[in-house]
Amino acid sequence: MISSTTGQEMTSREMLGYYLNKSYADAAAAKERGELICWSSSIAPNEFCEAMGIHVIYPENHAAAVAAKGGALDLLEVAEKKGYSIDLCSYARINLAYMDVQNCVAENIPLPDFVIVCNNICNTLLKWYENICTTLHIPMILIDVPFNYEDEISERSLDYIADQFVNAIRQMEEITGKKFDYDKFDKAMEISRESVYWWTTAMGKASALPSPLNG
C-alpha cells in the first residue's frame, strides 16, 4: 500500500495505524447511518458480528491508544471522581471515563448498541462490561469459557462453549432483527484461519538468531 503523504510503500506499522484509524472512521460513519456498533473484548468471536454486518470496536485497544498519546491521566481522574478505584485496570477506567466525556486525544469512537465479552482473559472484563451495559442500558452477550486444568480440552467444555455460541447467535438475531448469515460467517472464518496461519508463521520466526522480532 502506498502512503498518501510520502508516496512510498507503507511500513507494516504505518499500515496498522491506517487500518486502525479507518476502522474508527468507518464505525463513526456507520453510527451516523443508524447501523449497530458493538464493543468487544479483545478475544471474542467477532466473526459473528462480521456475519451480521455489525461494526466492532475494541475498548482495550482504544484505551491503549489514548495512553500512548498521553491522554490517560485526564480520563483516569474522571473515572476516579466517578468512584472507580485506582486499583482497577487502567484500561477499564479510561474506557468507563470515555463513555462520559466522549472525547480524547486519540480517535473518538461511537458508543455501542451492545457488547460482546469473553471472560478468558481476566476477571476485570466481566464487571467492566457489565458497567458499560448498566450505564448505557444496552444488552451484553457473554461467552463464559471454563478454566482448563489440563493440556487437553474436554468434550464437556467444548459442548458448553458451543451451546453458548448458539445462544450468542440467537441473541444477535434478536438485537439486529435479522437472521444470521452463515455464508458471511464461513467467509469470515476462512479469513480468520488464514490470519492465524500467518500470525503463527511470523511468530515462529522469533526462534531465529538474530531474531527479527523483539519484545
Predicted regions and their residues:
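Low-complexity, flexible helical/coil segments
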Residues: 72-78, 92-97, 149-157, 174-181
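Residues at alpha-helix termini
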Residues: 51, 134-135, 174
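Acidic/His-rich segments in extracytoplasmic proteins that coordinate ligands and/or metal ions
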Residues: 96-170
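An N-terminal, globular interaction/scaffold subdomain
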Residues: 39-108, 113, 120-121, 128-129
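A structural signal for short, well-ordered beta-strand segments and their strand-loop junctions
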Residues: 38-40, 56-59, 115-117, 139-144, ...
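A charged, amphipathic alpha-helical module
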Residues: 1-36, 162-215
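Short glycine/serine/threonine/alanine-rich loop segments
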Residues: 54, 138, 178
